[in-house]
Regions:
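Bilobed "Venus flytrap"/periplasmic-binding protein-like clamshell domains
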Residues: 1-53
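Sec/Tat-exported extracytoplasmic proteins
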Residues: 7-9, 27, 59, 74-77, ...
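Solvent-exposed coil/turn segments that connect beta secondary-structure elements
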Residues: 10, 68-69, 104
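Alpha-helix N-cap/helix-start motif
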Residues: 15-16, 63, 110
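Extracytoplasmic/secreted envelope proteins and their assembly/folding machinery
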Residues: 20, 49-52, 67, 110, ...
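A ligand-binding cleft/hinge motif common to bilobed small-molecule-binding domains
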Residues: 20-25, 54-82
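Short beta-strand->loop
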Residues: 40-41, 74-93
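An extracytoplasmic/periplasmic, membrane-proximal ligand-sensing/linker region
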Residues: 94, 100-101, 105-160
Length: 160
C-alpha cells in the first residue's frame, strides 16, 4: 500500500488480471477504490521482463509477473538479477495460454491440428517450450477459463 508497482501489461492474465482480481476479492480495490488509490504509482510494462526490470532499477517496489520468469533456469533473468528479487506472493493456478480455432474449422481438421500440437510434447519439446513455455494438454475449456472469466467480470466493476 502506498508504494509504486508495475504490472506486466494490461493484457496479461498472470501479470495483471489475476493479481487485481485477488486485490478486489480482498477489498483492497473495487468500484470505489482504484489501483492508484491503493498504490502510489501504477506502471505497465511490455511484458514480464520489463516489469521485473522496473523493480531491478528501483523505479517500483514490486511487480506482478508470471513465475516462469523467476523460477528455474530460463533465458529471462540471470542469477545475479534473481538474487536481487524475492517472491512476496503466489497466486494460482492461473489459466495458461489457450489455443483457439475458428468455429468453421471442421472437427477432423481440429483433430489434426490438436494432434500435431500435442506431438510436440514428445517430438520437439525444445520448440514447444520456446513457443508455449511448457507441456501442452487438452482441458475442459469452460472449467479452464472459469477463473479468467470471473476475473474479467470483476474488471468491469473496477474504478478506473
Amino acid at each position: 500500500k502506498g508504494k509504486p508497482v508495475a504490472f506486466a501489461s494490461r493484457s496479461s492474465t498472470s501479470g495483471y488480471l489475476i493479481p487485481t482480481w485477488d486485490m478486489m476479492k480482498k477489498g483492497l480495490i473495487g468500484s470505489q477504490k482504484s489501483l492508484t488509490d491503493f498504490f502510489s504509482l501504477t506502471l505497465y510494462g511490455t511484458g514480464y521482463v520489463s516489469a521485473v526490470e522496473k523493480v531491478l532499477s528501483g523505479e517500483v517496489e514490486a511487480a506482478a509477473v508470471s513465475d516462469y520468469v523467476f523460477k528455474g533456469n530460463n533465458q529471462y533473468l540471470d542469477d545475479a538479477q534473481k538474487a536481487q528479487l524475492r517472491i512476496v506472493q503466489e497466486q494460482g493456478p492461473v489459466p495458461a495460454h489457450t489455443l483457439c480455432a475458428r468455429s468453421t474449422l471442421s472437427q477432423s481438421d481440429r483433430k489434426i491440428l490438436q494432434d500435431a500440437l500435442l506431438s510436440m510434447n514428445q517430438g520437439n519439446p525444445e520448440l514447444r517450450d520456446r513457443i508455449f513455455n511448457g507441456e501442452l494438454i487438452v482441458v475442459d475449456q469452460d472449467k479452464h477459463l472459469e477463473v479468467t472469466r470471473e476475473a474479467l467480470a470483476f474488471q468491469k466493476k473496477l474504478k478506473p
